[in-house]
């Protein structure tokens, strides 16, 4: 189980990765000359160096002199970076980006970035050379991660597993002993029908047992259970209360799926996309609902940079709420009399001139930092949890547009 400190560290690392990814997505090459390499943690660095050497040799066949030179320079730069690593890359692997990016007016500049230990392990080695950097696998790692239990069943077979983020993990399966329907009448048919119902009931109990064994130990972490199969079967299963009552309470959707083998788990996830999207937003909605309740019902809420900063410094903030769309820097100023003040500006803008509100003197900039990293640093020191809030719903938009993308739920009222 991760500690609060680990969670904060992970949030910070994810945000730092997200910033780099946004930067990389803006870059364009004038041709297929931007190189991306994904290296899993179990891939020997020497193997990667050999692969790069081979690619460098093959790049000599590129007809365009400029593209040929740029690709080979990018490969050389990546090869130089790999000299700093031992036999294997760091935990979770490493992703390297290098290439000549366009700066306008026909000019280019060489950019090289290395991202060590991404949020999840790199799954496989990938070499990519194109007009843009390959960031999709990293973006998938940074996507909201839910944990959902999956059940697909008909009267012949069943499979249960997990949906972890975007990854489906089949875990258990079962085949039934339910016989086909009897066509003839008479007492033997009635007896057969009774035995068949008993076999169906036994199979449903077996499936529920698999699901209960897998999901109940994770009941405090699970975001929901999805059930799929033909209409009569899944409805009978759910209506029969076979699942543990704590699982029955978190069934968030049932869906018609044609297959009930392992591929049926993937079909179930595809069918549940709308429900899964709603579940991701629901957590953010709950945070914002609590924020507005605190805001309207008393003084245990704060918003805006300066009030939130002051409350953070006091250790009064339980949860720091930051908009996912916040893209600003904080500039710290100090006047000749030692008064310190802060100004939040668009990160694309230059430092504005600042006059001290206390003494009216011109102030000098002493620091400029990403506002999210600045606030998260204080939050980490004060044991405050940080939550990133989506703008895909009304109150999430309000946080960004009306409250400057910064708010907090307080542990106690401070009057600030």
Curated annotation (Swiss-Prot):
What domain of life?
Archaea
GO MF annotations, alphabetized: translation release factor activity, codon specific
Entries under SUPFAM superfamilies matching the protein? L30e-like, N-terminal domain of eukaryotic peptide chain release factor subunit 1, ERF1, Translational machinery components
Q: Which SMART domains does this UniProt record tie to the protein?
A: eRF1_1
Where found in the cell?
A: Cytoplasm
What is a single Pfam family found in this protein's UniProt entry?
eRF1_3
> Keyword Protein biosynthesis: yes or no?
yes
Q: Which InterPro entries match?
A: eFR1_2_sf, eRF1_1_Pelota, eRF1_1_sf, eRF1_2, eRF1_3, Peptide_chain-rel_aRF1, Peptide_chain-rel_eRF1/aRF1, Ribosomal_eL30-like_sf
Of the GO CC terms on this record, one is: cytoplasm
Name where it mostly resides.
Answer: cytoplasm
Write out the entry's keywords from A to Z.
Answer: Cytoplasm, Protein biosynthesis
Q: How does this chain assemble? A: Heterodimer of two subunits, one of which binds GTP.
Role, per record: Directs the termination of nascent peptide synthesis (translation) in response to the termination codons UAA, UAG and UGA.
Q: In which family does this protein belong, per the annotation?
A: Belongs to the eukaryotic release factor 1 family.
- This protein is called Peptide chain release factor subunit 1
Task: Look up and give the organism this protein is from.
Answer: Haloquadratum walsbyi (strain DSM 16790 / HBSQ001)
Q: Which gene encodes it?
A: prf1
């Amino acid at each position: 189980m991760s500690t609060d400190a680990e969670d904060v560290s992970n949030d910070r690392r994810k945000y730092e990765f997200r910033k780099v990814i946004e930067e990389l997505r803006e870059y364009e090459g004038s041709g297929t000359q931007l190189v991306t390499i994904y290296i899993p943690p179990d891939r020997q660095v020497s193997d990667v160096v050999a692969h790069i050497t081979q690619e460098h040799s093959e790049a000599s066949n590129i007809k365009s002199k400029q593209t040929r030179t740029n690709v080979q320079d990018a490969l050389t730069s990546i090869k130089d970076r790999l000299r700093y690593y031992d036999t294997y890359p760091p935990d979770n692997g490493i992703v390297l980006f290098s290439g000549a990016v366009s700066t306008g007016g026909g000019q280019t500049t060489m950019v090289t970035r290395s991202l060590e230990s991404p949020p999840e392990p790199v799954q496989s080695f990938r070499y990519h050379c194109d007009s843009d950097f390959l960031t999709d696998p990293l973006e998938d790692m940074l996507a909201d991660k839910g944990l959902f239990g999956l059940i697909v069943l008909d009267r012949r077979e069943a499979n249960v597993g997990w949906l972890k983020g975007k990854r489906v993990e089949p875990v258990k399966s079962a085949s039934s002993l339910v016989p086909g329907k009897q066509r003839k009448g008479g007492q033997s048919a009635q007896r057969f029908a009774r035995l068949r119902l008993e076999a169906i009931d036994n199979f449903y109990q077996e499936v529920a047992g698999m699901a209960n064994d897998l999901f109940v130990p994770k009941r405090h972490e699970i975001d929901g259970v999805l059930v799929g199969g033909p209409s009569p079967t899944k409805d009978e299963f759910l209506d029969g209360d076979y699942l543990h009552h704590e699982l029955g309470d978190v069934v968030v959707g049932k869906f018609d799926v044609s297959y009930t083998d392992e591929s049926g788990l993937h079909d179930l996830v595809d069918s549940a996309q709308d429900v899964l999207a709603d579940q991701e937003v629901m957590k953010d909605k709950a945070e914002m609902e609590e924020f507005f309740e605190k805001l309207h019902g008393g003084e245990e809420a704060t918003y805006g940079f300066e009030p939130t900063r002051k409350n953070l410094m006091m250790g009064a903030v339980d949860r720091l709420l930051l908009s996912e769309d916040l893209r600003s820097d904080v500039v710290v100023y100090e006047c000749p009399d030692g008064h310190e003040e802060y100004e939040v500006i668009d990160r694309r803008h230059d430092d504005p001139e600042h006059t001290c509100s206390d003494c009216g003197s011109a102030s000098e900039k002493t620091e400029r930092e990403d506002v999210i990293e600045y606030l998260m640093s204080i939050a980490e020191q004060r044991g405050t949890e940080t939550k990133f809030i989506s703008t895909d719903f009304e109150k999430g938009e309000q946080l960004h547009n009306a409250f400057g993308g910064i708010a907090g739920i307080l542990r106690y009222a401070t009057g600030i």
